[in-house]
């Protein structure tokens, strides 16, 4: 593993600028003109100001994670806020916090009217809107920070990756654990042979913490005047608005937050969390296209929503990778490593029937025989984590983000924290660390903002060139769940060879007026 030949493992009232009736022709016309007005796609900041100037940021989706994504950019100029719902507490709070920002309900109007004033956008909408919003901004050469999962379909992930590369857009996906020193240390040491050839990866999460396995509700409720339901649906098929299943039900049906379990809008527990929890092994093992994906749902699986839990197998072939010797931006100093085939297991939700659980515990975690050392380390298996098993040892990460890890080499009796294991001293730090502070969320955003100011997309550790591939892999698990069978995947052709019925879930047919183009 230490040489080239050894194998490796101005706020206005909402109504004054709100409309979901912007025509597609007018929007394309105006966005094309705005894009053409930019000097070779370079952000406005770099065309007329020095690098110490503040960026003009527009934030699309300001509730939930959108609140923290907006606040992470607070030291820049927040010039626009956009959200389809003006009844939320986030709307009241954020519009007050950023009084100089103009408010919109419709992101298309925002880009149409303010495109020349915007350097970058953050996108924190439901999953089904990510690609639509991101592509519109990128066509206008705006830098993009988009929440995970990057997209809702495999086709969209590949589409955004290609666009970002061709237009040289500064991009970042919101898997903030990427900013952590611990994750980067795990990646470089595993690549350099810390635990030898890795043959198994097990990743688990306590999600979903929202409703799943439900049928579409009957009936229809009046759409609140504060919500643009047509715009909220975006590319998804039209359906009646329904706020609650009954007047006594405290849980919303679609929004906010609980859209995650619906197949038309979210990506279930896998899409919501795998871009965090699989991030570290994906990078460390240089995972490319899987050849097989097989999902086993727990409980009811219907055509409307994801199941209460699942176990999914991803099979990856042997592969080669080129990694930097010292620094990922020194492109002429690389070495080739080789990885053996690897099986990645994903676990989410729970299995309430002890008779059906086999070797797994009730919270749907890896087999008990694989987690004994974890229990010895901390008394129990955590609700989320990942385990990499190599022929020279094991790495265990105990959280959602891969930000910390423990090492147990072959012949050792117990796990030790990576900062206290002597074996790591032989592996140099060759991946640059994020210098922007201890808060991974703020540091992750600052890395993106700094890259925009330098016009260097490669400075973003979660740029779309990398994270679109991660998203694509995980979304294939959603496809396998929806078709109800194993998928034999042809990555280069983007085709399920044995399952033609998977095609609509790989590239969906968007509602009229919402096609990617």
Predicted regions and their residues:
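Short amphipathic alpha-helix with an adjacent loop that forms part of the alpha/beta core around
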Residues: 109-116
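Conserved SAM-binding strand-loop segment of SAM-dependent methyltransferases
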Residues: 102-106
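C-terminal helical cap and adjacent loop that interface with cofactors, partners, or active-site loops
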Residues: 30-38, 245, 253, 265-285, ...
């Amino acid at each position: 593993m230490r040489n080239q030949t050894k194998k490796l493992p101005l706020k206005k009232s909402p109504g004054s600028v709100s409309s979901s009736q912007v025509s597609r022709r007018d929007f394309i016309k105006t966005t094309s003109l705005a894009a053409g007005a930019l000097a070779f796609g370079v952000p406005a900041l770099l065309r007329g100001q020095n690098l110490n100037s503040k960026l003009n940021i527009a934030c699309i989706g300001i509730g939930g994670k959108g609140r923290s994504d907006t606040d992470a950019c607070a030291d820049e100029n927040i010039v626009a806020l956009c959200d389809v719902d003006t009844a939320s507490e986030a709307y009241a709070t954020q519009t007050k916090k950023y009084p100089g920002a103009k408010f919109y309900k419709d992101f298309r109007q925002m880009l149409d009217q303010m495109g020349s004033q915007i350097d970058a956008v953050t996108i924190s909408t439901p999953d089904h809107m990510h690609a639509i919003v991101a592509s519109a901004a990128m066509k206008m050469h705006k830098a993009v920070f988009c929440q995970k999962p990057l997209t809702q379909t495999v086709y969209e992930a590949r589409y955004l990756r290609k666009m970002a590369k061709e237009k040289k857009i500064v991009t970042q996906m919101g898997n903030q654990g990427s900013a952590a020193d611990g994750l980067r240390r795990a990646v470089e040491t595993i690549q350099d042979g810390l635990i030898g050839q890795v043959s198994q990866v097990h990743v688990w999460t306590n999600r979903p913490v929202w409703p799943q396995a439900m049928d579409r509700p009957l009936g229809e409720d009046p759409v609140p005047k504060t919500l643009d339901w047509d715009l909220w649906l975006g590319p998804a098929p039209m359906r009646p608005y329904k706020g609650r299943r009954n007047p006594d039900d405290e849980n919303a049906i679609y929004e906010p937050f609980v859209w995650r379990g619906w197949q038309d809008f979210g990506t279930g527990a896998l899409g919501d969390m795998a871009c965090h929890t699989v991030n570290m092994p994906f990078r460390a093992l240089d995972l490319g296209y899987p050849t097989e994906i097989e999902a086993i749902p727990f409980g009811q699986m219907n055509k409307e929503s994801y199941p209460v839990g699942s176990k999914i197998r991803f099979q990856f072939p042997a592969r080669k990778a080129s990694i930097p010797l010292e620094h990922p931006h020194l492109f002429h100093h690389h070495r080739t490593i080789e990885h053996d085939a690897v099986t990645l297991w994903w676990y989410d939700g729970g299995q309430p029937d002890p008779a059906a659980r086999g070797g797994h515990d009730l919270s749907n975690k890896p087999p008990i025989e694989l987690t004994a050392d974890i229990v010895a380390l901390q008394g129990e298996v955590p609700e989320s984590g990942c385990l990499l098993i190599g022929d020279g040892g094991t790495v265990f990460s105990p959280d959602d983000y891969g930000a910390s890890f423990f090492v147990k080499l072959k012949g050792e009796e117990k796990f030790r924290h990576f900062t206290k294991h002597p074996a790591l001293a032989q592996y140099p730090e060759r991946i640059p660390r994020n210098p922007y502070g201890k808060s991974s969320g703020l540091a992750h955003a600052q890395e993106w903002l700094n890259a925009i100011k330098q016009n260097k997309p490669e400075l973003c550790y979660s740029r779309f060139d990398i994270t679109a591939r991660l998203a694509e892999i995980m979304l294939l698990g959603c496809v396998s769940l929806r078709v109800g069978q194993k998928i034999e995947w042809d990555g280069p052709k983007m085709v399920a060879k044995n399952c033609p019925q998977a095609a609509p879930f790989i590239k969906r047919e968007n509602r009229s007026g919402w096609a990617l183009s």
